[in-house]
Amino acid sequence: MELTIKQIRVGLNMTQKEMAKYLGISTVSYQRKESGIKNFYFLEVKKICSKANVSLDIVKI
């Protein structure tokens, strides 16, 4: 089973704005990354997975 970053965020009951703030990036930047226009940095994905207690192995990027 693979999870997208969006699925993880929704599972955490966080808005895009809240997740962007958690990562220390702008909301627009986060939206671009979540929609696939830009790529997430590895450390951003790692931080999201840590917050959600999800293994990096099951994240679909």
What do these predicted regions represent?
Residues E2, I58-I61:
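Short hydrophobic/aromatic patches at helix-to-coil boundaries
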Residues L3-Y22:
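Short basic helix-loop element that most often maps to the first helix and adjoining turn
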Residues K6, Q31-R32, K60:
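Key DNA-contacting residues within the recognition helix of helix-turn-helix
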Residues R9, L23-I25, F40-V45:
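A broad helix-preferring feature
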Residues T15, S26-S29, S55:
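Short coil turns linking two alpha-helices in DNA-binding domains
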Residues Q16, E34, E44:
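Acidic-residue sensor for enzyme active/binding pockets
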Residues I25-N39:
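Recognition helix of helix-turn-helix/homeodomain-like DNA-binding domains
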Residues Y41-I58:
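DNA major-groove recognition helix of helix-turn-helix/homeodomain DNA-binding modules
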